[in-house]
Amino acid sequence: KTFVRTALKDADESPERCTRNLVDMALHFSKGRFQQEFFEMARTMLNNDNSPYYPLIEDTLRHMDKEKLIEFGMNLGYNGCTQGAHIVRKIKRTENINVPWLFFLNIDSSYADLHSRYQAIFDQGKELGIYVYCLYTDGDPEKLLPLIEHNPDCAMILLCNSAAVTEDFAKAAESLNNMLIGVAYDDNTDTACLVLRDHRLLYSIYRMYTDTESDEILSGSYARFAEEMHCPFVAVLADPGCSASVRENVYKAVVGARVAQKYRTIPIDLFYDIERIGNIISPPSSIIGFKPDGSIYNIGSDGNPLEHNIFNESLRDILKESFSIDQES
């Protein structure tokens, strides 16, 4: 962190040089396959002097809190994809359990004591090497902030509805450095993004799409809106009922736009890109999520829903029973 802070000192005067130095430094110290592949790709992209990612980086460094960028980035890159990945691979090697590098939690914010309900899950996750969590609530996201604060070594991605992003929420979120807020794409997204930008918080937008709602993504209008909102990332997530062909077309468009550096924002597919990172860290990748009642979203190899509940079973036992290498092969 000290090295990164030192490198960021000249960010305001020369963001391009600062970015190149950070990428070169990261590539020099990177050890894992994921790190090396990621930073080699980043350096290749930044060799393009006209890359739209340069003005994106400059805007991000000027308008988002640097301590938040450092903490979230270190938690994601080091704790999650380096230190955590080492634990994930060790458990696979010694216990034959396929541990995901990230998992999703859909949380009902109306519960009176979220800490006692969920902290054990984060503790179990970290023991298994999981330091990256994607949290979603369709209720009040401010209720989740104490949970996020209590896990400062984790990178927390908090997905919420735009109407829930208020001045009070943004003010409460200012004290947290380990969180990126994902704002749902709807009629109020622009207002929510302006609030978060005013408070120098880390944010981006995400969109869940169906077969009939992919046109805006494929045409680029969704990404151009994200540019206007000054979002570092523009994420998509397929609805469970979305057809495989539409998912594949959207992912091809996401990767194509990212590689071509088409927009002043970085397109991400929350399913396929997470799966791809998982396959680099420890193949075969598993994407796991839990509903508000604790039941698991995942489908078994026989096509039937898995009957696990995170509130009744330990995470290790769930993974051992349904996500062991023998079980998946």
Language model regions located:
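A short acidic (Asp/Glu
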Residues: 144-146, 168-170, 247, 301
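Short amphipathic alpha-helix
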Residues: 120-121
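Core AdoMet radical
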Residues: 102-116, 125-142, 151-190, 196-215, ...
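Short acidic, glycine/proline-enriched helix-loop-strand junctions
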Residues: 143-160, 252-256, 262-264
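N-terminal [4Fe-4S]-dependent radical SAM core
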Residues: 28-105
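Conserved C-terminal portion of the radical SAM core fold
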Residues: 107, 132, 190-283, 287-296
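Accessory C-terminal segments flanking Radical SAM cores
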Residues: 1-36, 40-44, 249-329
